[in-house]
């Protein structure tokens, strides 16, 4: 099988946004224009091509990122549609890791919204070049320049229009191209009666002003244009395009375009912008990795001639073919039926079949090349974030980091038959989703599942019922609290047992202290002179790690602390690993009395959008939920309240908001950080956990 499109003519892009900005509809239109779909599915009718799980079609939201291949202007475009709902952050995180560029979709009425900020931050972390598509220009209250302003104010982004709309709301009828200085007029709803022509006289001055601003913004990050600009030379269309491309790929500039995907306006120019300004796999730096032992830094260039390397970014259970592993090829080629090494797990895997995906229909292919995104059937041990590579040229590519779950609930199978099936279902769902955890509570024997939010767990329980036919009773949601130390102490833990014959002996002195937020647990061995033999040191660390999960105040995991092993003693005959493990956990227990142990709770960044008349009530309600109002903005006729509120106080908020605003208020929340729980509430939590 020969390569169909050159690497230079390949684009791997994601479509990302806040919920309801119109991402899935935008992707649908792209597929329609690139000839992949003949009839278009509307999201609100539950017939969209990209949203193929039953729950997605019922709820009209996108949960899993479907990967699709399309063709446009002699290029292959691989598109990943990512969910905008905050509970599915992990889907966005893993798709961004394997993309070369992205289209950020904004709602023209709202501009940048909370989830846009989250996704934008994630894309910046991974250095992903972006184009911004301001969608829904036909919506009441649509305001293009306001939306562009929110990119500057909320994201501090160097984003500038390369198009201007003619008209807005129901008068939106044409788009001005500021690079080529021409206009595209739309004659009908389907976007088929399209004509190109001169910019209407009454819009000419505005277009010239914004073209000048565009050149000015590009010149500030591109020396070639800067020189010509300062010398007053004419900048040609080709030079301006090339400079915008360079600055966009360098993640120093973000071109802004507009349209309304639902009415087919602005979709073709968007596809052209993807080709013109977003990078091909050869325009982005070679991917970095390490040798298997971690000692040597390696890199893999985007080329078919390099050894094969790929990153698995999603695992799914498919009803027809079983386990599907989506992967992005960074270098080399791979034939179906061949063997690869999973270097992250040290396992050899056979790639049974390779499928090219189109939302949820698929086409079998015999070979993949550098830059491709495809799905493999037959991989047994591979999970999200694993590296697959050539067996003779091992490399481990940088993996992904996933946030910790913040909310839990108990699930109990309704019958014995459900119990066995539930175990398998939970295992499969955990393989698919790294932010979903399931464990058995050792004290109550209940199965506890944890995830990123109520909707996240709701959908997973729903999938257990539909896909795995497991009926279960679900408990009320619980907050995932954490514990930490606020002060330092040096403590001893000594475990001795003499019971005839060989005894047990372990003795450690450990300095415990608070660590920086987000740094987790750090262990340092500062033993000198062999007072504890080297072979027992790992047992001390293991004993501490085991005890951390059980907590010291109310049974919640202990985070962000340092433990420095400074002294101890051992017995030639009686000492063993178990004794040192127990001694370490005794030291931690002692430290909890001296280190000012506290309970931490997840704090959520909440944004509430409400009509002005409800402002007082809503702010009062936020304060009554122990929230702090951090700012307010006017957005059209609405007020936007930004606040930091404990997750524990946000359960059922959707219902409260709905009744307080007669259904006119909306809110969104994202996890922000952990904060100490007030003493009175901590006392209640401890009491409840001890069953008093």
From Swiss-Prot:
It is found in: Cytoplasm. GO terms for biological process: ribosome disassembly. The keyword Oxidoreductase does not apply. GO terms for molecular function: GTP binding; GTPase activity; translation elongation factor activity. The keyword Protein biosynthesis applies. Keywords: Cytoplasm, Elongation factor, GTP-binding, Nucleotide-binding, Protein biosynthesis. GTP binds at residues 17-24, 81-85, 135-138. It holds the Pfam family EFG_C. Residues 8-282 form the tr-type G domain. HAMAP family: EF_G_EF_2_B. Belongs to the TRAFAC class translation factor GTPase superfamily. Classic translation factor GTPase family. EF-G/EF-2 subfamily. NCBIfam families: EF-G (TIGR00484), PRK12740.1-3 (NF009379), PRK12740.1-5 (NF009381), small_GTP (TIGR00231). This is Elongation factor G.
